Amino acid sequence: LDLYIVDAADQERRPFVVTENSEWGASLSPNNDYVAFTTDLSGQYQINVKRFPPTEERWVISSGYGEEPFWSKDGSEIFYRRGNQWLSTPVKTTPEFEAGVPEVLFEGPYGNVYGISYGVDANGEKFFLLKQPDQAPPNEINIVNNWTKELN
C-alpha cells in the first residue's frame, strides 16, 4: 500500500509516500501542512509525519508500534493506537515540526477493523471506539451417533 495525493481540479494522482513497504491511514493536520500516517518502514507499524506538500523530511512520533493516527482539532497532538492502548504525542507544527514524548491515555478492548477503528471529539477528551464483537454462545449442538462407523 502506498499514499498518493489526488488534485481535485485535474484528478491527477501524484505520489506522496511510495515505498516497498506499506503506508496507510493518512491524517492531514488541521493547518494542512503535515500528514501523519502508518508505515512499516522500520519492520513494524509506526506513526510517521511528513510535510505537505511532501519533502524528504520524515519524523517518527510513535515509540515502538503504532497505527491509526488522528490529529487533534487544534493540531497540538496526534492520537494513535498501539494494540489495545490509545496514546497521544504532543506536537508543534510552527515554526518547525517538533514531537514530544508519547503518553498512554487509556487501554481497553476494541473492535479491530481494516482502517481507522476510532474517532475523537473536537476537544480531544472523548474517544469513540468500535465495540469488540460479542462472542455468541453456541445455539446448536450436533450429535453424531455411531461416529466410529464413519471412520471406516
Language model features with spans:
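Beta-propeller blade-edge and WD-like acidic-aromatic loop motif
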Residues: 1-15, 33-34, 38-60, 74-77, ...
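Conserved beta-propeller blade repeats
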Residues: 16-38, 59-79, 110-126
